[in-house]
């Protein structure tokens, strides 16, 4: 009897050990194979993710880098910038159309580089080119999603609490036109408090 109990306990410990060491997180909608990078970039044009930066400083800093602030497209937390001299600008050796900044209060939370097209095939080609460039620097974590508006998505997770998400997705413009976006978003959890589950 003791021998059977010992075997049962060993079997349960083995199952628990195996399930705890899995790198996959599974839900009904998505599966994520997690890979962590030591650090993901957190500074862009002199602005650091997670830092408290007033709106006027963000606007002046980016204007000095050749961008203009699209006030008519921005809100208090979502700031839209475009290149002053042409339709495109470069970052990381790649060409982009749009730069969007997200903040909560005065804390800089994310920086989004984005391109837009009406053609899914060319957007997926752009996605794959960006993916190859980013993966020369970071190891990916790929997510499988059932969201029909997302054609491809890859995460780059940093132990420094900064992550990047590369996505190719469908969206509708204000004028009700369907577009395909390709975005590279750097975002942080710095300064965010864990959710409190107390009532």
Q: What do the PLM-derived regions correspond to, one by one?
A:
Residues 24-78, 113-199:
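Non-cytosolic coordination micro-motifs
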Residues 16-19:
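C-terminal motif of bacterial Sec signal peptides marking the signal peptidase cleavage site
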Residues 9, 22-25:
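Intrinsically disordered, low-complexity serine/threonine-rich segments
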């Amino acid at each position: 009897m003791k021998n059977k109990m010992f075997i049962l306990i060993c079997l349960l410990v083995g199952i628990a050990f195996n399930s705890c060491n899995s790198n996959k997180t599974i839900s009904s909608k998505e599966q994520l194979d997690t890979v962590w990078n030591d650090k993901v970039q957190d500074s862009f044009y002199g602005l650091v993710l997670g830092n408290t930066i007033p709106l006027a400083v963000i606007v002046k800093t980016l204007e000095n880098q050749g961008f203009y602030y699209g006030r008519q497209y921005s809100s208090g937390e979502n700031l839209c910038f475009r290149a002053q001299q042409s339709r495109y600008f470069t970052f990381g050796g790649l060409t982009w159309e749009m730069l969007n900044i997200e903040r909560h209060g005065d804390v800089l939370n994310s920086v989004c580089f984005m391109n837009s097209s009406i053609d899914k095939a060319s957007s997926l080609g752009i996605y794959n080119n960006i993916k190859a460039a980013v993966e020369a620097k970071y190891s990916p974590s790929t997510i499988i999603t059932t969201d029909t508006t997302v054609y491809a998505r890859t995460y780059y997770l940093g132990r420094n609490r900064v992550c990047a998400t590369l996505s190719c997705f469908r969206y509708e413009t204000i004028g009700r036109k369907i577009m395909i976006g390709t975005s590279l978003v750097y975002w942080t959890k710095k300064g965010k408090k864990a959710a409190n589950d107390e009532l």
